[in-house]
């Protein structure tokens, strides 16, 4: 508890900067509209909240229905808080309308939450007959944003009060003095009735906030665990989470790829939008894992190459007749492509480029014979990355942009390796690039942010990062 209060105290100093932000981790900016929608959805009782609110089997169930928190045997039902009122006056709660949610972010503290609802009641009137009443109620609460013992963002109810509004009489006769009696009873019981509702709603939202931090699988490569790097920040428009991605191997060991020294420059967030920023580090880490696992290496054989791609000694000799003119003709070629170093990703000027340094060993062989080495090349392949977001990850599709080669060693005469660049580009584009795209199907994982769907987000490549923006 002491640690939690210490965090709350520090929070008063933590408010986000409105200028161009520089960061090296994953960044999530949650617009206040999204937080408001999460609270509203918890009241409606969406299927995702069934474990918290109970089974949702009909329109009138859920949080407000007969089987929910407030209806039936709940707070509004038989035996609930209003049982006391019923014993005193025969007053019974008949209906509670879906509250209207009003939300205000409090920089350096948390949230001011208001729920405006209408309570429908009936009772036996003092003059006989049935009285039907309705009272407007505003529930106002101050909610602190803190960090739980698990290291997740958490909303904590600090203060709650109710304000009784207009009371309407729909049927029956009620003397004016009894209006005051009803008002006094409601004033006493409503805080005990509706403030626990706020606490329950916050519990639902806290589960969604807690999902921001968790383990995301990278398939055979390992996983990424997201954790808070710093205290969350609060402005009057959004909550900002600075998230540290921790990469782990399949065995669970932490893989510490060097982070870029150049921070990402993220533009200011527009109103009524939420953002996730994917840092350069995650791109370099993904390609680094692929390289260390050998997923970027390939043996290119004639069986893998389309018929329109030349891959024989005859084709090669035509390109370099002075160096390779004496080779036996019509023999098939083998290309052993090995990426010896981690690729380098560049995110700059609305483009995503990947540089792959590779050694290409070219051999020829007679069917059923032993392959014979011709030469080795040191190459740098520059591929362009097309990025597409989905709900859970950022998909990457590669296409070759350019290729440069130098001769590392030759078992024939010396030659200028640049004369093979066009031919190799044809081979790599036809065979190697599709293989890379299969390996990259794992994508770049996105943290879960209040169940916000980023599949239709606007994607922007900025300096050393990719920013996904979705309208609230």
Swiss-Prot record:
It is found in: Secreted; Cytoplasm. Detected in nasal septal epithelium. GO terms for cellular component: cytoplasm; extracellular region. SUPFAM superfamilies: Bactericidal permeability-increasing protein, BPI (SSF55394). SMART domains: BPI1, BPI2. The keyword Disulfide bond applies. GO terms for molecular function: lipid binding. One of its GO terms (biological process) is innate immune response. Residues 1-16 form the signal peptide. Coiled coil: none annotated. The keyword Glycoprotein applies. Disulfide bonds join 160-195. Belongs to the BPI/LBP/Plunc superfamily. BPI/LBP family. May have the capacity to recognize and bind specific classes of odorants. May act as a carrier molecule, transporting odorants across the mucus layer to access receptor sites. May serve as a primary defense mechanism by recognizing and removing potentially harmful odorants or pathogenic microorganisms from the mucosa or clearing excess odorant from mucus to enable new odorant stimuli to be received. This is BPI fold-containing family B member 3. It comes from Homo sapiens. The gene is BPIFB3.
């Amino acid at each position: 508890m002491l640690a939690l209060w210490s965090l709350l105290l520090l929070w008063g100093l933590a408010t986000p900067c409105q200028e161009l932000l520089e960061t090296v981790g994953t960044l999530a900016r949650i617009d206040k509209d999204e937080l408001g929608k999460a609270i509203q959805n918890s009241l409606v009782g969406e299927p995702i909240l069934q474990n918290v609110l109970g089974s949702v089997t009909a329109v009138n169930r859920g949080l407000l229905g007969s089987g929910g928190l407030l209806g039936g045997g709940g707070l509004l039902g038989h035996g609930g808080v209003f049982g006391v009122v019923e014993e005193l006056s025969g007053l019974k709660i008949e209906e509670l309308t879906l509250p209207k949610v009003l939300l205000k972010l409090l920089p350096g503290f948390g949230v001011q939450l208001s729920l405006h609802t209408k309570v429908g009641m009936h009772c036996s009137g003092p003059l006989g007959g049935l009285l039907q009443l309705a009272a407007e109620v505003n529930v106002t609460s101050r909610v602190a944003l803190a960090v739980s013992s698990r290291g997740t963002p958490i909303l904590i109810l600090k203060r709650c009060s109710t304000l009784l509004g207009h009371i309407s009489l729909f049927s029956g006769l009620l003397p004016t003095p009894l209006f005051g009696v009803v008002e006094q009873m409601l004033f006493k019981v409503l805080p005990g009735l509706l403030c626990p509702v706020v606490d329950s709603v916050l519990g639902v939202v806290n589960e969604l906030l807690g999902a921001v931090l968790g383990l995301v699988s990278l398939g055979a490569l390992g996983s990424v665990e997201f954790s808070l790097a710093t205290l969350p920040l609060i402005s009057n428009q959004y909550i900002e989470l600075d998230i540290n991605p921790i990469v782990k191997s399949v065995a669970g060991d932490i893989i510490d790829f060097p982070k870029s020294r150049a921070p990402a420059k993220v533009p200011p967030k527009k109103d009524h939008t939420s953002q996730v920023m994917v840092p350069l580090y995650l791109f370099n880490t993904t390609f680094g894992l692929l390289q260390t696992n050998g997923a970027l290496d390939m043996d290119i054989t004639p069986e893998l190459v389309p018929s329109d791609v030349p891959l024989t000694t005859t084709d090669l000799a035509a390109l370099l007749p002075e160096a390779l003119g004496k080779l036996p003709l019509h023999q098939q070629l083998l290309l052993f492509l090995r990426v010896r170093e981690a690729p380098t990703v560049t995110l700059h000027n609305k483009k995503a480029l990947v540089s792959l340094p590779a050694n290409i060993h070219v051999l020829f062989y007679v069917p059923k014979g032993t392959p014979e080495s011709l030469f080795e090349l040191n190459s740098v392949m520059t591929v362009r990355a097309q990025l597409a977001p989905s709900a859970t990850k950022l998909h990457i599709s590669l296409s070759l942009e350019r290729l440069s080669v130098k001769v590392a060693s030759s078992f024939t005469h010396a030659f200028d390796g640049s004369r093979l660049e066009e031919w190799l580009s044809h081979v790599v584009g036809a065979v190697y690039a599709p293989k890379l795209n299969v390996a990259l199907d794992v994508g770049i994982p996105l943290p879960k942010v209040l169940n916000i769907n980023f599949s239709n987000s606007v994607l922007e490549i900025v300096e050393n990062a990719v920013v996904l923006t979705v309208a609230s």
